[in-house]
Swiss-Prot record:
Together with the chaperonin GroEL, plays an essential role in assisting protein folding. The GroEL-GroES system forms a nano-cage that allows encapsulation of the non-native substrate proteins and provides a physical environment optimized to promote and accelerate protein folding. GroES binds to the apical surface of the GroEL ring, thereby capping the opening of the GroEL channel. Coiled coil: none annotated. The keyword Cytoplasm applies. The keyword Chaperone applies. Its main location: cytoplasm. CDD domains: cpn10 (cd00320). This is Co-chaperonin GroES. Belongs to the GroES chaperonin family.
Length: 96
């Protein structure tokens, strides 16, 4: 299945989190924290401005980003893989 975001939406695949602590302890269950880093796998056409023009997004496919997983993030499963759909405004930084 293929998925294409609309407007200012971005689709991310969450980066896997280390399952060991810095001291070498294996973390399980509630001790693990979900990563707020992800790889951009698709971007929408851009943000629609009040004057009717479209502003292109700052992120592009392949970018590694840090995001804010707030109320606006939508988690879906596509072909068995978990993806996140969020607005570009929820992306805090591009990791270079």
């Amino acid at each position: 299945m293929s998925i294409r975001p609309l407007h200012d939406k971005v689709i991310l695949k969450r980066e896997e989190v280390e399952t060991c602590s810095a001291g070498g302890i294996v973390l399980t269950g509630s001790a693990t924290v979900k990563s707020t880093r992800g790889k951009v796998i698709a971007v929408g056409t851009g943000r629609l401005l009040e004057n009717g023009s479209i502003q292109p997004l700052s992120v592009k496919e392949g970018d590694m980003v840090i995001f804010n997983e707030g109320y606006g993030a939508k988690v879906e499963k596509i072909d068995g893989e978990e993806i996140l759909i969020l607005s570009e405004n929820d992306i805090l930084a591009i990791v270079e």
